[in-house]
Amino acid sequence: MSFVPREAVEQAVKEALEISPKRNFKQSVDLIVVLRDIDLRSPQGRIREVVILPHPPKKHVRICVAADGDMAVKAKEVADRVLTREELQGLVGNRKAAKKIAEFCDWVIVKADLMPLVGRTLAPALGPRGKVPIPVPPNANIAEIVKTYRSAVMLRAKDQPQVMCRVGTEDMPVNEIVDNIFKVLSTLEGKLPNARHNIAKVIVKLTMGPPVEVKLR
C-alpha cells in the first residue's frame, strides 16, 4: 500500500507505546481504520472478514469447539472449551447459557454437521457480539485449526464506517506489530472499491491510551 508508508506506521506504533500510561495489565495494541464513501447498507459495502495475523498477539485467545466423536476428543487437548452435541441441545431455549458461552469464546469452531444446531442455539448470541461460528469439515485437523485461530482477528464494519481490531500487545516487538497492521490493511485493500480513497484515517492506540494517527501519503 504505497499511500501507507511503513515508516509512518512504525512511528505511530512507537508513539502510541510511549505516550500510553502504564497499567497493571497487559494492554492490547488496537488498529482503527476510518472509512469514507462506503455504503454500509448494501451487502457490497459491509465488511466481515477473518484475518490470520503473521505474529500472534501475546494475549490468550479463547477457542471453543463444537464437535462430537473423534474431533471432540482431539479438541479437548487444544481448545479452551468443547461443546458436545448434547450440550448444544441443552441450549435450546436457554438464552442465558448461550450468552455466557458467547461471552467466553473469542472464536467458535464448529464441526460442519453441527452448524444447523449451532445456528439455532448459539449463533443468536454470537452475532450481537461481532462473532460468527466457523464451520470445518469432519476430517479437519482440529489442532491446526485451533492454532491458526489463536492468531485470527475479525474485521467488521456494519453500523459505523470504521474497522477496529487488535494487532498486538504492548510487549511485542514493534516490527511484529507493524507486520500485523499491514496484513490487516492489505486484506482491507482487497475488499474496498478504491482503498486509496476509501481509507480516510489509520489510527493506532493502546487499550487505555490516546489515539495516534498514521501520516498517510
Swiss-Prot record:
UniProt keyword terms in alphabetical order: Repressor, Ribonucleoprotein, Ribosomal protein, RNA-binding, rRNA-binding, Translation regulation, tRNA-binding
InterPro entries listed in its UniProt record: Ribosomal_uL1, Ribosomal_uL1-like, Ribosomal_uL1/biogenesis, Ribosomal_uL1_3-a/b-sand, Ribosomal_uL1_arc
UniProt keyword tRNA-binding, yes or no: yes
MF terms in GO: rRNA binding; structural constituent of ribosome; tRNA binding
Keyword Cell membrane: no
UniProt-listed GO biological process terms: regulation of translation; translation
UniProt cross-references to Pfam families, sorted A to Z: Ribosomal_L1
GO cellular component: large ribosomal subunit
NCBIfam families to which the protein is assigned, alphabetical: PRK04203.1
Function: Binds directly to 23S rRNA. Probably involved in E site tRNA release.
Quaternary data: Part of the 50S ribosomal subunit.
Family: Belongs to the universal ribosomal protein uL1 family.
Annotated HAMAP family: Ribosomal_uL1_A
Alphabetized PANTHER family for the sequence: 54S RIBOSOMAL PROTEIN L1, MITOCHONDRIAL (PTHR36427), LARGE RIBOSOMAL SUBUNIT PROTEIN UL1M (PTHR36427:SF3)
UniProt protein name: Large ribosomal subunit protein uL1
Species whose genome carries this gene: Hyperthermus butylicus (strain DSM 5456 / JCM 9403 / PLM1-5)
Gene that produces this protein: rpl1
